[in-house]
Structures are given as structure tokens and as C-alpha cells.
């Protein structure tokens, strides 16, 4: 197995509170990276998840930024990107999906498919990302497994194939039958872990000895139905994102995660070709190429440092080698590239396709930037969507203006939110997906940059990026709508409509102007 074939790079994504970060912790435990998984069950236990490294994440018990964890597991090199589950941070998750080769979607067995899960599955479908679905919390009362599978197919518009099956659920949960490895994983409630792994023929009497007569009979009937209704395991269809593999379990118990983990590493794809604007880039190509999908400021609060996360797409990244920054047409060398365990970094000498490399950033990178050995190529990313909430940001401490401006600039570079400058009054407007992002921005400005800000309401409905082949009409529109015009950070014209009616009237009155609801067109 060569270096490319042994790479596994994936994201763990889900609706809030489905147990995604808990599952990540268990995978780290199985990979030997941590001795005890951070208890994220409730706030009384003062441990925090290893992948939740920001202070605000530790305080609130939620993930607010994608974290990267890399480790060896058997013959494989694994890169996990643990994403924010809260819907306010959907854009960070969308960007993360540009950098992975496959994804685990975590679904709560009681709640089933939720709005956030549907949205994320849409992005996976757009990129044909192979998907494994982990139905979590089978040790609690929830929906019937067959009902959940029907819901997954209908709501996520993807065929499913179960590779494990629960033996009862809720208080009667006894464990799982691993269909993929034809093995029983049994669970004793008072020990909260797998007590026994048994290879057993489900048609033999030995099954009754382990789970009892009633559960043995039900398991046989369920598995017969699974084989009759759902497609057989097909690696090609899974790799094309046409069929999702489904596992059922309970992430906070050591069972389920490990069965999923061993199977997932075996069937997950190695790095795949990536479409650039100019051509298809293949991982086995000899020359290095990669793109920046995330920027994080203050990953170490003791040092005001920025780290750009680079996904290696082809060739081999080598420390201190000269690489072309395509957007700026400059040659750069990196003396201290790093790999990650949440906020803990270690310097590396080389990296291969599928790896995530941390590059020191002093303001030269933007999300979507490409690095190559000289070729002028541009990787396609995901666009920014029109924000759903808008507020003016004002300086609450005039003595800290410099710190505030630097903080806003770095947080916007990270993609925490979007910044617009109103052309009419010059005021800065922050656009976000939800209210929690405003709180995170205010918290981070105060704690990381020693700057104070306050929010003022502004009544806006939608941000529209505008363009037109008719220069005269474009200028006429900008003149008439001057008080609603803004510039984004790239200097592009943005129309800030304050209502759906105003937007529709503008589209009707100016037929030659194109109104875009994403920043890439």
C-alpha cells in the first residue's frame, strides 16, 4: 500500500446534539490518540472534547469551528475533520466538505433526519461525496430502525444499505449484529461497553444462548428483510455517492463506534481526483498542488498566529520547497508546516494527497487560494451564500480601534461571517447564518483581540451580488439604489434589499441586471 492509498480523509457532520463530537472522541480513543474521551454529556463534568479547543467551545459544550485531527490507525493514515453541528455554523461545514474524500453523517435515532442534515446531504450530493450514516443513541428509546431507513431514503434522496443491525433498543438494547463482519457485539448496561464479541452463525442455536429466544428470532427476521429490501454492498456505487452505508449504535458506549470505525477505514475511499477550473487534478501526479479551505486565527492564544489549512491534492508537499501562490503569482517557502491534534501542532517534513497541512499565515492567504509547483490552476470551492441575519458592528472602545479592525479582518478571513461596507454611510455590516455567530464574534473580539464591539439592528432581507453586460444600466441601478449598495471584502457590488418586495421590484425594473444569491457566479 503506497502513501496515497493509505490516506483516509473524512468529515464527521450532523445536526446539533446528534452525538458527532462524542463519536469523534471515540474514534480518537480507538486510534490510540487519547486515553480518555472528553465527557460531553453534560456541563457538570468539567472535561471537554479533545476536538473542541476554543475557549468558547469548552464553556458552552458545542463545536463552533472545524478542527483537524490526524493519526495512524493500523496501516492507514487518518485525517478527521470534526465540524460544527450548530446550524449557525453551516458555512464552515460546507467549506470543510470541499477538503474531504468521504463523510460520516450522524443521525439521532429519536429525532431522525433534521433540517441541517438535509442541507449537508445536498452538499455531499453536489460533490458526489461517499457517505456513511451512523444512527446514534440506539441505547435510548427512538424510532424503529426500518422507519429510520425509510426516512433516510426519502429525506436525503439516497439509497441505503445497513451494515449492522441493533438487537433491540432503548432499555432493552443488547448490542448489535455486525453484518459486514458477521459478528455479534454484545453490551451490558451496567458496564457501558462491549463485553463480548462473538462470531456466530445467526441460524444456529448459539444465537439464542447469547440474546434469548425472542430477540434471536426477531434478529433473524429483520436481517432476512434487510437482505430482501436493500441493495447488496457495492463499493463502486458507494464511492460514487449513490448508496450510503448505514451503521447503528451508541457513540458514548465504546460499542458501535469501533465496529463502524474498523469497517469505515476498510471501505472508505483513498484521495480522489479533484476538478480544477482548467483540468482534472489526479492525486498520483508527480507535482504538488493544494488549496486553502480554512483559515484560523489565534489557534494558540499565547501567540497571535494565523494558520491556513491546506488540502494536498496531488504530488508531495515538502518542507522548505518553493511553491507558487497562484492568486498573487508569488513564490513561497514554508519552514514550519504542521499537522494537528486540535490545537496541538507538530512540524512535518512532508505530506501526501489527502493530508491537511497547517501553513503559517501573515495575511497572504484567502479561502480558495491555490498552491502549486508552478502551474496556474484554480480549484473550485463552495461559494458564500447570502446571509440570513444582518447587524451593524460599532466600536465600543475608541481607544481600541486598531485592535477591533484587525480582529474583524482576521475573523472574516476565517469565514466566520461576511462583511459588507455600506456605500451610503460607510458603516460596516456583518452578515451571518444565525444569532449565535454574533455572540461568537463579540466573544472572540473581546478575548482574543482585547477589543469591544456592540451590535446595532439593521432591517435587511437579502444580500445580492449584482452584475450586468449593460454598463449604463448597472450604473443607473447603483445610483438609484445608492443607500442600499455595499461592497463585499473582494470589492464586488452587493445590493442589500430590505424586503422581498423591494428585491422583486428591482428585478422587474432592471431586467438586464443579474441578481446572484451566492458570491460565485
What are these language model-derived features?
Residues 1-521:
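Structural and coupling elements of P-loop NTPases
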